Amino acid sequence: MIQKETQLNVCDTSSVWVVNTFHIYRGFRHRIGRLGDYIKVSIRSTKPECTIKRGKKKKAIIVRHAFGRLKRDGSFSKFSSNVCVLLKKRTAPLGREIKGPIFYGVKKKKFVASFPGRV
């Protein structure tokens, strides 16, 4: 579960390592973001050759979080870290490819990028 001021890793090839959450697009009373939710982030750490500077604001989508999730078939999935993908537009990722497994519920959000794995 992602709240405001949560730091997340980035799993695409946009040369950004760490971002900080400051807004969750979920509704007025919802303070916690879950898998597949859109968030607004600020860039905290980048590679030296990156064109995106520290402090810039971007939109992102949550693709993994450390809080466990019970699936409909009864299995339990849990990731080791909180991870997001930076977005250019509402559905276009900033990097060319996405690294690591992605939760299958993100595909239901009509996210047009092809994902490497399914969990």
Curated annotation (Swiss-Prot):
Indicate where this protein resides in the cell.
Mitochondrion
Give the residue range of the signal peptide.
none
An example Gene Ontology CC term for this record: ribosome
- Name the domain of life this protein comes from: Eukaryota
Keyword Ribonucleoprotein carried by entry: yes
Coiled-coil regions listed in the entry: none
Q: Which GO BP terms apply?
A: translation
**What keywords sit in the KW lines?**
Mitochondrion, Ribonucleoprotein, Ribosomal protein
Q: Name any one GO molecular function.
A: structural constituent of ribosome
The record's CDD domains line, in alphabetical order, gives: Ribosomal_uL14
Q: Which InterPro entries match?
A: Ribosomal_uL14, Ribosomal_uL14_CS, Ribosomal_uL14_sf
Record keyword Ribosomal protein present: yes
SMART domains the record matches: Ribosomal_L14 (SM01374)
Q: Which family does it belong to?
A: Belongs to the universal ribosomal protein uL14 family.
Q: What is this protein called?
A: Large ribosomal subunit protein uL14m
Which gene name belongs to this protein? Answer: RPL14
